[in-house]
Swiss-Prot record:
GO terms for molecular function: ferredoxin-NADP+ reductase activity; flavin adenine dinucleotide binding; NADP binding; thioredoxin-disulfide reductase (NADPH) activity. The lineage of its organism: Bacteria, Pseudomonadati, Pseudomonadota, Alphaproteobacteria, Hyphomicrobiales. It comes from the Bacteria. The keyword NADP applies. SUPFAM superfamilies: FAD/NAD(P)-binding domain. This is Ferredoxin--NADP reductase. One of its GO terms (biological process) is cell redox homeostasis. Homodimer.
Length: 342
């Protein structure tokens, strides 16, 4: 077992609602750690519509999904939250009243007094490519997210996909890997034009390979990949050496392991009471799109409201002997000091 990471609050989901919750918690002296299955913060905003304008954030006439994420990250800087990205909380065990032990699929173990589920519609799950036997290599040679770039040092890496993730990791891993092969169904990419230009320049210089087609089979033993068979768009079949494969076929939304934690569910959503958005288990809260209650509206601004009320109740669990005196950031010198503006 890895060393236990102890924190006041563990937040599952680093989208806008989770990020703002960390701000509210920080004002009340509660330390937060985040776990998110995505390899970057921002949730749906950053993953699905980073450049799409949002028009219903109070006081901000319009902002992009990435712009909102960047602003929230700047806002929570004074509280130094810790992020564990590319991971998913698999198990939650109650060890106190309240206290919880949470374990991720990467083997990290957290102990917290408060657990906040801010996972949007659930966890983003990578789409598995239709390659026979690929399951045997998952987690050892086939990866759906990059957790450590060093994992791919001096390896022949096959990256499959044509979106931003595929292009970004092609460029980022190029200096690390022995050889990068990018495979896509067609010679058109749904990625930032500058990234596509950089990739094509590397191909032209002979520093990486670009192939058009799809993977039809994998070769290897004991979960260790040694090669892949590719059927090209011209129907020619070739074999390439590869030690690692990174398929980026997009994401699908699933409730995920939440269903196994003993939390009450209602149509794949988490019902909560509306004074603090607590679930049926004391100390576990749900905010944002994943929760449900009478009159629920799935707006980011509603999730901000939920995070503010949640933090007030969370304070009772983290500091049971401490009386909470409500303060305003406009007039409280102690809050301004925490924010570094006094």
């Amino acid at each position: 077992m890895s060393d236990v990471i102890k924190t006041d609050v563990l937040i599952i989901g680093a989208g806008p609602c989770g990020l703002f919750a960390a701000f509210e918690l920080g004002l009340l002296d509660m330390k937060a750690h985040f776990v998110d299955i995505l390899d970057k913060v921002g949730g749906q905003c950053a993953e699905l519509y980073p450049e799409k304008p949002i028009y219903d954030i109070p006081g901000i006439p319009h902002v992009s999904g990435q712009g909102l994420t960047d602003a929230l990250m700047e806002q929570i800087k004074p509280f130094h939250p810790t992020f564990h990205l590319g991971e998913m909380v698999e198990t939650v065990e109650k060890i106190g009243d309240p206290a919880f032990r949470c374990t991720t699929d990467a083997g990290k173990v957290f102990e917290c007094k408060v657990l906040v589920i801010a996972a949007g519609g659930g966890s983003f799950q990578p789409k598995r490519p239709p390659v026979p036997g690929i399951e045997a290599y998952e987690g050892t040679s086939v990866h759906y997210a990059v957790r450590k770039m060093e994992t791919f040092r001096d390896k022949n890496v096959l990256i499959v996909g044509g979106g931003d993730s595929a292009l970004d990791w092609t460029l980022n891993l190029h200096p690390v890997a022995k050889r990068i092969t990018l495979l896509h169904r067609r010679d058109e990419f749904r990625a930032a034009p500058h990234s596509v230009e950089q990739m094509r320049a590397l191909v032209a210089a002979g520093k990486m390979d670009l192939r058009l087609g799809q993977v039809t089979s994998l070769a290897g033993t004991d979960g260790k990949l040694t090669g892949a068979t590719i059927k090209g768009n011209d129907n020619n079949v070739t074999e390439i050496a590869c030690d690692a494969m990174l398929p980026f076929f997009g994401l699908t939304m699933k409730l995920g392991p939440v269903a196994n934690w003993g939390i009450a569910l209602e149509n794949n959503l988490v019902p909560v009471e509306t004074s603090a958005f607590e679930t049926n288990i004391s100390g576990i809260f749900a905010i944002g799109d994943i929760n449900t209650y009478p009159g629920k509206i799935k707006l980011i601004l509603c999730g901000f409201h939920e995070g503010a009320l949640m933090s007030q109740k969370a304070h009772r669990y983290v500091y049971p002997e401490k009386r909470l005196v409500f303060q305003y950031t406009t007039s409280s010198s102690s809050l301004q000091k925490k924010l570094g503006v006094s």
